[in-house]
Amino acid sequence: MANLKEIRAKVASIKSTQKITRAMQMVAASKMRRAQERMAQGRPYADNMRRVIAHLVQANPEYKHRYMVDRPVKRVGYIVVSSDRGLAGGLNINLFKKVVQHVKAQREQSIEVEFALIGQKAVSFFKNYGGKVLGATTQLGDAPSLEQLTGSVQVMLDAFDKGELDRIYLVSNGFVNAMTQQPKVEQLVPLAPAAEGDDLNRTYGWDYIYEPEAEQLLNGLLVRYIESMVYQGVIENVACEQSARMVAMKAATDNAGQLIKDLQLIYNKLRQAAITQEISEIVGGAAAV
């Protein structure tokens, strides 16, 4: 059994660690709120762009853009969004399980897969998992910019344009609330079929005069829209990372507190036993005299 000095040292060490985990919890909570604000700020941009795309498509029904037309699927690409750092509970593990499950279903249909990776954790995972990686982006920080992501997006779009990919998916974590993050797989290209009530299904009674031509404008807008979807996925993943880290650090702080209580109880019992023994020795010595 540990002596009193060893227990005191353990308690001091755990208290020091507890201060760190509590500080990390508070920092993660602050970063999560900022990431949520960026999520809210980015949505109107993507929504308005989708409305303009919908109007262009309806105004030019004879023009079928390649990013909006399904074709036989032989090869698919995945843009996988993970975090750069750990200490986020099972956030990345659950995401990779989702990817592996989806990839397995594709391979069972003899469909080849390729990847573009965002985040150091994804890079590390796919080194062991294998698969053809077309590009990787890491060290995005807590406030990633759209410019940092264009490389990973463009390499996949280039492969699609060349016919090397027939479909592109975005895999990231969805922010449900501060306690819950849900990995999800979304079809990026071709644009997923519009749901009822979606802007792509809406009929507009007005028209614009476009400069440049509508087809040329649609080409650029679709690329920007796809980039914005990936950006939103990355920003949402940052919010998920920080919320998962906040929860993990709170659990670590609480566990440290419980461990300190348990060690303090052991310390008190040992100290009580030592005092009792000393008293017994004194009484025994006095009786001998």
From Swiss-Prot:
Keywords: ATP synthesis, Cell inner membrane, Cell membrane, CF(1), Hydrogen ion transport, Ion transport, Membrane, Transport. It is a peripheral membrane protein. The keyword Lipid biosynthesis does not apply. GO terms for biological process: proton motive force-driven plasma membrane ATP synthesis. Produces ATP from ADP in the presence of a proton gradient across the membrane. The gamma chain is believed to be important in regulating ATPase activity and the flow of protons through the CF(0) complex. F-type ATPases have 2 components, CF(1) - the catalytic core - and CF(0) - the membrane proton channel. CF(1) has five subunits: alpha(3), beta(3), gamma(1), delta(1), epsilon(1). CF(0) has three main subunits: a, b and c. Belongs to the ATPase gamma chain family. This is ATP synthase gamma chain. It comes from Acinetobacter baylyi (strain ATCC 33305 / BD413 / ADP1). The lineage of its organism: Bacteria, Pseudomonadati, Pseudomonadota, Gammaproteobacteria, Moraxellales. The gene is atpG.
